[in-house]
Amino acid sequence: MMKQRISIFLLFTLLLFANGYAQKGIMRLTQQTLMHEVRETPSPLDGQHITVNPPRFMWPDKFPHLGAVLDGVEEEDYKPEVTYRIRIARDPEFKSEVITAERKWAFFNPFKLFEKGKWYWQHAYVNKEGKEEWSPVYHFYIDEHIRTFNPPSLQEVLTKLPKTHPRILLDAEDWDNIIERNKNNPEAQAYIRKADKCLNHPLKHLEEEIDTTQVVKLTNIVQYRSALIRESRKIVDREEANIEAMVHAYLLTKDEVYYKEGIKRLSEILSWKKSKYFAGDFNRSTILSMSTSAYDAWYNLLTPNERKLLLRTIRDNGKKFYHEYVNHLENRIADNHVWQMTFRILNMAAFATYGELPMASTWVDYCYNEWVSRLPGLNADGGWPVSYTHLRAHETDSYL
């Protein structure tokens, strides 16, 4: 009994101590939120001591854009094309050795290490008449022992981008070597087995594949579209895995049977965009992903009409995603599914068609610079932690 009383007393004392400690640790906030959903302040902040050299320059959009709330529920937002200018110098009057740039999005990467000391910068929105609306002049500091992280500029990257295909999943110059290295690779064999299975199971039209027994009972438009997307994604995701298997099987063997069945299957999938059962950004990004992989892997086998079909699909879907992201994604504090999936796919499409699709050069410029501006993380202590399932989303092929 005495031991029980002592235990209760110790527990009570511990709770009082913990409560007192917790009270001391309370942070009183004066702001409405801990962070902005959409950027409202420039970076670097005025007077900031930079943590990584060179700094990435970002500022609020002239026309902040929230985007759609739910995948598949389209919203018409006013989002005009914009032009921004930026200038950076050691003096606040910007009279000598000024770094200047003009961008179609609200960020800029200088790709040069900054000397230690005090720097000044300013950004401007340029209207259609060419009039500049300049921000206040901000200053920041480059300290003595700052970390450096200066990736190559886009111009340097593009000099090393192969002009031949394939060039995304593998480099054509290393193709035969990759095949030889992976003859006994279990992962490579798994792709080939899956592709062989697809050869014996022709694909039906979406309306014959999708299960809509529960969807048709819904009367709420949001629930209806959400359920429709969920059911159609089951089919589209399955076929993405099948096309992926046939693309990989061809790259691992150069056996044209995988191209012939794969392009037939993909052509059927691309016809689904006219179906009332096909909707949503995830489905569109999957279409973009499949078309990009097929275009790059089977480039040398495609007929003129097949190549035209894939390029048109990449152009139409890539254009939509680019327009959705530019002057939106760069100023969102977090948009995790975009970074994991749809934006990554736009990157692949951009580099796969660079030099062959006129607008791909703009996509490449935006995508590459957006990655650089957001790395090595959203803040000085790194990026966001991922769970096991999120790590699975970033898996790559070991045979590559």
Locate the predicted segments by residue.
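Low-complexity, Pro/Ser/Thr- and charge-rich linker/hinge segments at domain boundaries
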Residues: 141-170
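Pro/Thr/Ser/Gly-rich low-complexity, intrinsically disordered linker/stalk tracts
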Residues: 24-67
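Bacterial N-terminal signal peptides
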Residues: 9-16
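Recognizes extended acidic, P/S/T-rich segments that occur
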Residues: 78, 83-114
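Extracellular fibronectin type III
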Residues: 130-142
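Extracellular Ig-like/FN3 beta-sandwich strand-entry sites
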Residues: 116-118
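Aromatic-lined, polymer-binding surfaces characteristic
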Residues: 227-392, 398
